[in-house]
Regions:
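Extracellular/periplasmic, surface-exposed regions of secreted and cell-surface proteins
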Residues: 1-26, 36-249
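Phosphate-binding loop and its immediate beta->loop->alpha context
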Residues: 29
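N-terminal, polar/charged subdomain of small-to-medium soluble alpha/beta proteins
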Residues: 32-33
């Protein structure tokens, strides 16, 4: 939505969702394991859903020889997955692969549900002067559900600039283009869902009762966001109307 001739408001929302079901049947005498010699049946139901929402305010303005652009935004990402598994072995009646054809003691049920949410605010400022000098500043702050409360907020900025020095030279057929650039950036990253907790889980769930066990993985309640820092310098030059050139980073 165009608020003014230089100010625009944009909202985007998208969803990615899929369902997957698979069924595996091992006929009698078709397995190596002795307990499966009278047949085995397994079914998996997987549901995945990813929701993304972005609200952006964009401003573009030209002031004398300067082109100025500002972007402010807010985003939300929500990821959910559900996996339901059930298995059974030792068919009562031969060649009839059905869970109704398996004793309760030989059935296994397992359910796993995962949810993760990430919310962020971000901004980008871009400025250029006479197609000669360019400057870009960015910053983003995220809040994640996968880290401890004290560490779930993290900020990461970046700065980049370039100088097109070929604009200072008169136009000629030999030297076509020359630019030097430099940038510094930080990128933040969270972790997987439930990585901070150690909990019991139900590896096998019988129809006649339930069972729980300790996980082989121990959670870390002191996890912090991962911050990656990078610095880049580069030189790009082209000659003979762009036919020959190089780009070094």
């Amino acid at each position: 939505y165009k608020l003014t001739d230089w100010l625009t408001l944009t909202y985007r929302m998208g969803m990615d969702r899929y369902n997957m079901t698979d069924r595996t049947v091992i006929a009698e005498n078709g397995a190596v394991a002795p307990e499966f010699q009278k047949g085995r049946l397994s079914e998996n139901d997987v549901t995945y859903e990813y929701l993304n929402s972005n609200l952006m305010l964009t401003a573009s303005k030209r002031v004398n020889d300067f082109d100025l652009n500002l972007l402010l935004g807010q985003s939300v990402e929500d990821t959910k997955s559900t996996v339901n598994r059930r298995t059974g072995y030792k068919f009562i009646v031969s060649d009839f692969p059905s869970f109704d054809n398996i004793n309760d003691g030989n059935k296994r049920l397992q359910s796993n549900r995962t949810q993760k949410r990430l919310m962020g605010v971000y901004g980008e400022f871009r400025a250029s002067y006479k197609s000669l000098l360019y400057l870009t500043l960015t910053g983003r702050n995220d809040w994640t559900s996968t880290l401890p409360v004290d560490n779930r907020s993290y900020f990461y900025p970046s700065i980049g600039s370039s100088f097109v020095f070929s604009e200072l030279f008169p136009e000629n057929t030999i030297f076509s283009f020359g630019k030097v650039r430099a940038s510094w950036a930080c990128v933040g990253k969270d972790t997987d869902a439930y990585a901070t907790t150690t909990s019991l889980f139900a590896p096998l769930e019988f129809l006649a009762g339930t069972g729980v066990g300790n996980s082989w993985e121990r959670g870390n309640p002191y996890l912090k966001p991962e911050i990656t820092e990078s610095t880049e310098l580069g030189l790009e030059m082209r000659f003979l109307k762009g036919r020959v050139g190089f780009d070094v980073t």
